[in-house]
Structure formats: C-alpha cells, structure tokens
From Swiss-Prot:
Molecular function, one GO term: DNA binding
Domain UVR: 215-250
GO biological process: nucleotide-excision repair; SOS response
Name of one Pfam family that matches: UVR
Subunit structure: Interacts with UvrB in an incision complex.
Protein location: Cytoplasm
Claim: DNA repair is one of the keywords in the record: yes
Protein's name in the database: UvrABC system protein C
Cellular compartments per GO CC: cytoplasm; excinuclease repair complex
Function noted in UniProt: The UvrABC repair system catalyzes the recognition and processing of DNA lesions. UvrC both incises the 5' and 3' sides of the lesion. The N-terminal half is responsible for the 3' incision and the C-terminal half is responsible for the 5' incision.
Keywords annotated in UniProt: Cytoplasm, DNA damage, DNA excision, DNA repair, Excision nuclease, SOS response
Similarity-based family: Belongs to the UvrC family.
InterPro entries linked: DisA/LigA_HHH (IPR041663), GIY-YIG_endonuc (IPR000305), GIY-YIG_endonuc_sf (IPR035901), GIY-YIG_UvrC_Cho (IPR047296), Hlx-hairpin-Hlx_DNA-bd_motif (IPR003583), RuvA_2-like (IPR010994), UVR_dom (IPR001943), UVR_dom_sf (IPR036876)
Length: 625
C-alpha cells in the first residue's frame, strides 16, 4: 500500500494552523504563503504580521472570492521581519517581482505602452524610447509607461532640437564627429569634445522635462538668459531664448482646472472587466497635466489593491522630486497609510493620499476614470477580435479548444548557403517574442548549391521536441512550452517531412500540425491530399497568415545577419595569423572591415592581441604594393 505524503492545507489541520500562527511575531514584515507544491502563491506585508496573517483564517473575515480560494490552498506560511514598515513595503515589491505569485495583483508587461530611458549608467547618457524596461541597467532611469506614443516621440523630437545631445549608440567615425556635430545637434560626445560632467548637465535639463518640472526649467533658463544678456553674450542669450520657446511649446494647452496651481499631485483611477484592469495615472504639476501613464493588471482582486500595486510599482524607483505632495485615488487603498509614510520619508515632505468625494478633485478623478474606461473598451474590442480569430481557427482545424500557444516555423537560405530556421510563438493570438528561437541548420546534405527544406524542417522539429521524446515522463499537459498548434510555412511536402519525424519520436498523436501555402493561403492537414476548404479572409486564416509572415520575417533577418557576418569574416580569414578571436577584436574595435582597411599600422597595433608585426601584415593585405 502506498502512503501519501502530500501536505494538507492548513485550514484542514486546525492544530497545525494555530501553532504556525502563534510562531508569527507582532512586528512589521513580509509573509509568504505556499501551496502543496512548495510554490509561493501569495506575498503580503503588514505592520503587524501576526494579526494580518491570522485575519485570513478568521471566520467572518471579509475576503474576496480570489483570496478565499487562495486560503484553501495554503499549506505553509513563512515570514521575514523588517525594522520598519517602509522596509516591508520595498521588500514586498521586490519579492512579488521575483516570484510572480499567482494570487497577487500583477501588473502586466504590456509592450503597447512605451517608456523614455536615460542611460545614466554610461559616461555620456543616451535618451531613447523603448518598450523593454527589463533590459535597463541599475543606474538607468525609465519614465512612463506613456499612453500616447506619438506625443512621447514629439516631446523627444523637440528636446533633441533645443538641447544638443548624443544621437547614436555607437560612433559613426573613429577619428572625427559626424554631421550632427556640425549642425549643432550633438556636442561631439563620440570624440569627447565635451566632458562627461558638462554633458550630464544637458541631460539633467532634459530629465526635468520628464519629471514634470518644465516650468522650473524655464525659470532657470530665463535667469541664465538674462545673465548672458547682461554680460553682452548675446549669442548665448539667443540660444537659451530658443530653448525657452521650445519648452513653452510643450506646455501649451495643458492646463488642468484646479483651484490652486502650486501643489504637485498625481491622480489615479481604473476601469475593469472580469479579466483586466486598465489603470491611468495623471501627473499634474503647477496646474499642468505633464504626463499620462498607463498600466494593465489582472482584475482578480479588490480595486483598491490593484491601485495600490500600481502606485508601489510606479514610485519604487522615483526620485524625491518625482514624488508628488498629494495623490488622489479612485478607491481606498488597503495600506494607504504605510505607502504615504514611505513616500513621505523619501520625499522629505509630507505626502497625502486621499479619496476625493466632492468638487474639483473628485471631478479630476472622474476624468481619469473616463480615460481608463476608453482604454479598456479599446483593449476589449481588440481582444474580442483576437479571440474570434482563435475560435474561428479552432473550428477550421476541429481543435478541442482555442489554441493558447501556436508555434510557426520557416526556413531561409540562398541555394542552401547559410541555411537557418525560425521558431516564432503567438500566445493568445499575439507575438510572444521572448519565446522566439532561431536555428542554424546542421544537416550535412544542406550546403551551398544544394538546398533541402524538407530535411531542414525535420531537423528543427526534431531538435525542438527531442527532450520530450527522450523523457516520456516529462509533463506535457499544463506545460507552458508545449504548443497547442504547430504551423509550417509550406505545402504538403513540408508538412509530410515534419509529421514523419514526429511519428518517429512518438509525438504525433500529442501535437496538432498544419502547413500554410503562400499562393492561395491554403491550409494542409496531415494525411489529407487536398487543402482544407477555407476562405483566405476568414479571421482564423488571417491569424495563421500573420504567424506565417512573422516566421518568414524572423528567418530572413537571421539569415541576413549570418550572411553578413560570414562576408565580414571571409575577407579577414585570408590574412595569415589572424584567427577568429583576433578577428572579433578587430571588428569590435573598428566596427567594420572598411574601417580596418582605412586604419594605419599604428592604429591596428593598438588593438589588444594585435602586435606591430601582425598589424603590418593586415595593413599590407589591404594595401598591396
């Protein structure tokens, strides 16, 4: 007889529950709740750990349906004691980001909303728009996410026009500045014609724009302009005057009707349906609306908790000047006093969080809520179209359910040379680029002058699913990496090669595979000699076409990259004594073979690993007598 060692939920073991609760101290800190798989399913904070955790298990405690479900799954409770509530708040935010517990309010990484990044980690910081906040370094600063990408681009364009700044991630030339320097758009950072300290002063002015301190910056520049004019430096005064004019154009028509125009405040509200919550945060400084930020969260929580999570995320990396004196919220926050205390300590002035009930401030919250509602409607309309496409595809292919994860594969080469493959992934009908993969084809029969798409596709599919074939015990159901559908770019031949290799791996019964031919958008199914009878304009077919086109684009871009790298290496391969490592050193230093050819012997010898003798051989190769 097998004895189960599965741990029961604490609610089913009252004695163990009471003992565990008694061990929790009445101090500030963070608590973890785990299920019987030892996964952290919830993380919370409290100024009194014991009373907060005990409240979850108290009869009559007002719990949401989601939290009530969570409590029934808890098998273990852990905690970390902190010195202050502020430390607990910061620790909780970091741990939620790290573990992504299922029952916590989680802000979605919605790449629709862009950020403005300033790379303070570099001596000469860059300023650019990005949707990939997670790639930034510790000292880099992100502002956003912004609801209006067009407006953000316009602000960046104006800032580039009025403040000379670094324009390129890498220098265009090794020994001279580019045209942007001659036009006054860049102070020549590539040749270090300005010091890092002076350049950072320029960037700090731009940062003030995104901190909502435009009027403060205008006042500073006005003083500098007047001082320059008094010193008869009229050229400098005229330049500053133009900067002030450009900044004033940013603040035109941005007035918000409030009785006072001196208090800095943020106003946050949301609109939610059964699945998603769209959150909008308006930043108001000196009576001006200087920023509209947007967040998306799961809606399976109390509305106040969702708002608090968004505020904690937003203010986690905020500077003291970016924290407002007043925060208006649509719903009461569960821990507004803790959040207010933390923000007060960081700002050095009292920060107030309140839910306005009347007059102008309540009207402001209503305006923010209306904007959140419009965004939710737009998201829902797009989501409905997407879901309709997945339902249509499920009907066309007779799938048991709508396909959550779809993978698309394509091959790219030129007559067999540099053959590569792409794997792209759509999750719920949208590209999930973090799951994209590319493959270099290793099949010895695929060489220059001899292509074999059938063998190439078979190789890629075999490599993709090899671990499942080698380990039959490896779970497939519920595995987020297991596709509900595979689409091959091609016709019957390509599909047959893929189904054959899946049959050999004993995986064909567990995977649905189709191919999509280019000419008539025809869908081929395994074992069928003729394509399915479908209309190319059906939503499901259009979804497959988007997947096919994305797989083709990704494969072609990787093929071009491989071909370009090979062309670069092939010329350097002809130089005796210049191995692969030294080639990388040269290309990393000079950026291209053309710049290597233009370099002098002493310049070549400066590269690590390239001595005077090899430098002379490289120079002689490009400059034969």
């Amino acid at each position: 007889m097998t004895i189960s060692t599965q741990i029961l939920p604490l609610v089913k073991e009252p004695e163990r529950l009471e003992n565990r609760l008694a061990e929790i101290p009445p101090e500030p800190g963070v608590y973890f709740m785990r299920d019987n798989s030892d996964r952290i399913i919830y993380i919370g904070k409290s100024r009194k750990l014991r009373s907060r955790v005990r409240s979850y298990f108290r009869d009559g405690y007002n719990k949401t349906e989601r939290i009530a479900t969570m409590v029934k799954l808890v098998t273990e409770i852990e905690f970390i004691v902190t010195d202050t509530e502020a430390e607990a708040l910061a620790l909780e935010a970091n741990l939620i980001k790290q573990h992504q517990p299922y029952f916590n309010v989680l802000l979605k990484d919605d790449k629709k909303y862009p950020y403005l990044c300033i790379t303070w980690s570099e001596d000469y910081p860059r300023i650019f728009i990005t949707r990939k906040r997670q790639l930034g370094k510790e000292k880099d600063k992100f502002y956003g996410p912004y609801t209006d990408a067009g407006l953000l681009r316009e602000i960046v364009r104006i800032c580039k026009r009025i403040f000379p700044q670094r324009q390129r991630p890498q220098p265009l030339f090794k020994d001279r500045p580019c045209l942007n320097y001659d036009l006054g758009r860049c102070p020549g950072v590539c040749q270090k014609l300005t010091s890092p300290e002076e350049y950072r002063k320029i960037v700090q002015k731009i940062a003030m724009v995104f901190q909502g301190r435009t009027q403060e910056l205008i006042d500073i520049l006005t003083q500098q302009m007047n001082a320059a004019a008094e010193n008869l430096n009229f050229e400098s005064a005229a330049r500053i005057r133009d900067q002030i004019s450009g900044l004033k154009s940013l603040t035109a028509d941005q007035k918000v009707s409030l009785p006072d125009d001196t208090v800095s405040r943020d106003a946050i509200a949301l609109a939610a349906n059964e699945e998603h919550a769209c959150i909008q945060l308006f930043q108001i400084r000196a009576g001006q609306l200087v920023g509209r930020l947007a967040f998306v969260a799961d809606a399976h929580a109390e509305l106040g908790a969702i708002l608090q999570r968004a505020l904690e995320e937003h203010y986690q990396t905020a500077d003291s000047v970016e924290i407002p004196l007043e925060i208006l919220v649509q719903h009461d926050l569960p821990d507004s006093d803790i959040l207010a205390d933390v923000l007060t300590q960081r700002k050095g002035k009292k920060v107030t969080i309140l839910t306005p009930l009347r007059q102008t401030k309540a009207e402001l919250i209503e305006m923010v809520e209306r904007n959140a509602q419009y965004e939710l409607q737009r998201m829902q309309k797009f989501g409905d179209r997407n879901h309709q496409a997945m339902q249509d595809l499920a009907a066309i292919l007779d799938l048991p359910d709508v396909p959550h994860r779809i993978e698309g594969y394509d091959i790219s080469h030129i007559q067999g040379s540099n053959a590569v493959a792409s794997q792209v992934v759509f999750i719920d009908g949208l590209p999930a680029k973090q799951h994209y993969r590319h493959y270099k084809i290793k099949n010895p029969t695929v060489t220059a002058g001899h292509s074999d798409d059938f063998a190439s596709l078979a190789e890629v599919i075999q490599r993709r699913f090899r671990k499942y074939a080698e380990d039959p015990q490896l779970s497939r159901l519920g595995n987020p990496d297991w596709p509900d559908l595979i689409m091959i770019d091609g016709g019957k031949g390509q599909l047959s090669s893929v189904t054959a290799v899946l049959q050999e791996m004993n995986l064909l019964e567990d995977l649905r595979v189709v191919s999509l031919a280019k000419q008539r958008e025809e869908i081929f199914l395994p074992g069928e000699s003729k394509p399915s009878s479908t209309d190319a304009e059906q939503p499901g077919v259009q979804l497959l076409r988007r997947l096919r086109d994305e797989a083709h684009r990704f494969a072609v871009s990787f093929h071009r990259q491989q071909r370009s790298d090979k062309l670069k290496r092939s010329r350097l391969d002809e130089i005796p004594g210049l191995g692969h490592h030294r080639q990388k050193q040269l290309l990393g230093h000079f950026r291209s073979v053309d710049y290597i050819r233009q370099a002098t012997t002493p310049q070549l010898a400066e590269v690590p690993g390239i001595g005077p003798r090899l430098a002379q051989e490289i120079y002689d190769y490009f400059h034969p007598a």
